[in-house]
Amino acid sequence: MDTIFALASAPGKSGVAVLRISGSRAFHAGRVLAGGLPDAQRTSLRKLRDSDGSVIDEALVLAFESPNSFTGEDCVEFQTHGSPAIIAALMNELSALPGLRLAQPGEFTRRALENNRMDLAQVEGLADLIEAETEAQRKQALRTFSGELGQKVELWRKDLVRAMALLEVTIDFADEEVPEDVYPEVQELLGRVSQNLAAESAGTHAAERIRHGFEVAILGAPNVGKSSLLNRLAGREAAITSSIAGTTRDVVEVRLDLDGLPVTVLDTAGLRETQDEIEQIGISRAMARAESADLRIILIEDGRLPSGLGVADDDILVQAKSDILPSSSEFAISSVTGRGIDRLVKAVSHRLSLRAASAGTATHVRHRLAISSAVESLDLAKTKISEGFPVELVIEDLRQALVDLESLIGRVGVEQVLDEIFANFCLGK
């Protein structure tokens, strides 16, 4: 297998740059450039030289001996000054060495997966950690990256393997008396796994929302102050405001960090009866996005709801323009003076935080589908046991459930998703 190298830090000028080398010839490459290497898991300050002996830079050099490295292979890292010229010179020297090539996106992590340094869920957690923009995203990604889902899968797997082994006993003793009735223990094991999977499945929606962001739609009649509220929340002129009704015709989105939660606030077209075909399209889009939103803020000006809009239990009704229309409403705001905005934001954050609290460790659609498939197989197995089906058919259902669970951590049937996952990594990962 080729030895690979890449810049592990962000490209461009910086105080420090990190260049990573991994593979069987990593130590040789390190010695060629640095004149020698420190002991494994140690660091030393060395001059890096080109093939003519000229100094390229003075850098911290680290060596990691297989399997105690990120990839599980021999690895060398150079921590250099973050000059593009220095990195280009080092890349040129490494490219000229036999058996070395530039890494593909995510190739270091792919090797870590292949060498069992991490499972597939941890790989996804690492990708999410790199992309995390808010505190909630960081915490969730770190849980996945730390292997929490893999630990759960291993517990579920042990219970299923135990249940299958017990059932196999009844086949082995088909013509003899089975030493003991195994079905009570089998049913207990399957019940426990089913209960755990149901709990994990219940938290997938919240976990996915944390990854992608919650959506909060602002609804109301034209000129009620929806765009003004969006601009106040964004702290900038994200949407055009005008006294002309129907100014907003498409959905305007603003990404916010509300108490660590990723939230996309949607400014929508004013809801009213209109003959304007373009405005009608905008209103239809507004209603569609509002239906799929996690939370709706409904602005009212005269105490009346916009035509055709029903109110859900979790909607937040807000009296707008409180600077000119005094109100005793729980949520009365003025986007001009800022009155009531903090109270509204806290209410939104609180309601979304309650939903986020139910998030599990299964954070991707792939995880949810695999768990759902495993639950379906377990339900079939339990039904067949209760109806007296042949044991072989029950075992086959349990085996399918096991395959579904093992796909969560990349043991089986995930080759088709690897390229998509690793394509989103940078070269140095």
From Swiss-Prot:
Keywords: Cytoplasm, GTP-binding, Hydrolase, Magnesium, Metal-binding, Nucleotide-binding, Potassium, tRNA processing. It is found in: Cytoplasm. (6S)-5-formyl-5,6,7,8-tetrahydrofolate binds at R20, E77, R117, K429. Its EC number is 3.6.-.-. GO terms for molecular function: GTP binding; GTPase activity; metal ion binding. SUPFAM superfamilies: P-loop containing nucleoside triphosphate hydrolases, TrmE connector domain. One of its GO terms (cellular component) is cytoplasm. InterPro entries: G_TrmE, GTP-bd, GTP-bd_TrmE_N, GTPase_MnmE, MnmE_dom2, MnmE_helical, P-loop_NTPase, Small_GTP-bd. GTP binds at residues 223-228, 242-248, 267-270. Its cofactor is K(+). It is an enzyme of class 3 (hydrolase). Mg(2+) binds at S227, T248. K(+) binds at N223, S242, I244, T247. The keyword Methyltransferase does not apply. GO terms for biological process: tRNA methylation; tRNA wobble uridine modification. Residues 213-353 form the TrmE-type G domain. Binds 1 potassium ion per subunit. It comes from the Bacteria. Exhibits a very high intrinsic GTPase hydrolysis rate. Involved in the addition of a carboxymethylaminomethyl (cmnm) group at the wobble position (U34) of certain tRNAs, forming tRNA-cmnm(5)s(2)U34. Belongs to the TRAFAC class TrmE-Era-EngA-EngB-Septin-like GTPase superfamily. TrmE GTPase family. Homodimer. Heterotetramer of two MnmE and two MnmG subunits. This is tRNA modification GTPase MnmE. It comes from Dinoroseobacter shibae (strain DSM 16493 / NCIMB 14021 / DFL 12). The gene is mnmE.
